Every structure is written in C-alpha cells, then in structure tokens.
Amino acid sequence: MKINQPAVAGTLESGDVMIRIAPLDTQDIDLQINSSVEKQFGDAIRTTILDVLARYNVRGVQLNVDDKGALDCILRARLEALLARASGIPALPWEDCQ
C-alpha cells in the first residue's frame, strides 16, 4: 500500500490513541511512540503497529503515536483508518491483506 499524503486518526482522550502518518522518501519506517503505559506495554504497542504495517505492505512512512492507554483492538482500528486516509482509498483492500 502506498502512502500518498499525511493523515491523522484518533483522539487524545483517555483509552484512545492518536496516530499521525507522513510519507518518507526512503523505504524506512520511522516510528515514534509516546505512551502513558510505555514501560508496561511499549513492546506490545510497537509489535502491533509493525504487524499492521506489514499486513498491508506499508513502507517508507513516519509514524507518530500518542497513546493514552488504548486497547490493542483500538490501536489496530485507528491504524487501519489512518492507512485508508493516507493512501486516498475509500476502503481497505481486505481481500489483499496477508
């Protein structure tokens, strides 16, 4: 999936997450995580984000994640909404994801 434009999904409310994405000129993934529960769940948050990016074959992006204790399912949903917005497609290609 090609990320064409910057996008934002989520809120800064307790129990939610705000994620910002922007395309990069390289194929790297620049991941910045700021979380109120990073000491306990930082590795799980990072793993979830990288799993979703790999599932949709996303490379060459900068991600800024401001987590306020979001559950894994909320993190995945916000990230999938973000990918759809940033790629300019109306819906995610569910049948193509791995």
UniProtKB/Swiss-Prot annotation:
Pfam families: ACP (PF06857)
Positions of post-translational O-(phosphoribosyl dephospho-coenzyme A)serine modification: 14
GO cellular component: ATP-independent citrate lyase complex; cytoplasm
Any single biological process term in GO: citrate metabolic process
Induction field: Repressed by H-NS. Part of the citCDEFXG operon.
InterPro entries: CitD (IPR006495), Mal_deCO2ase/Cit_lyase_ACP (IPR023439)
Keywords annotated in UniProt: Cytoplasm, Phosphoprotein
Subcellular location: Cytoplasm
Gene Ontology MF annotations: prosthetic group binding
Principal subcellular localisation of the protein: cytoplasm
Subunit-level organization: Oligomer with a subunit composition of (alpha,beta,gamma)6.
Protein task: Covalent carrier of the coenzyme of citrate lyase.
Family (UniProt): Belongs to the CitD family.
Protein name (database record): Citrate lyase acyl carrier protein
Lineage: Bacteria, Pseudomonadati, Pseudomonadota, Gammaproteobacteria, Enterobacterales
Gene from which this protein is expressed: citD
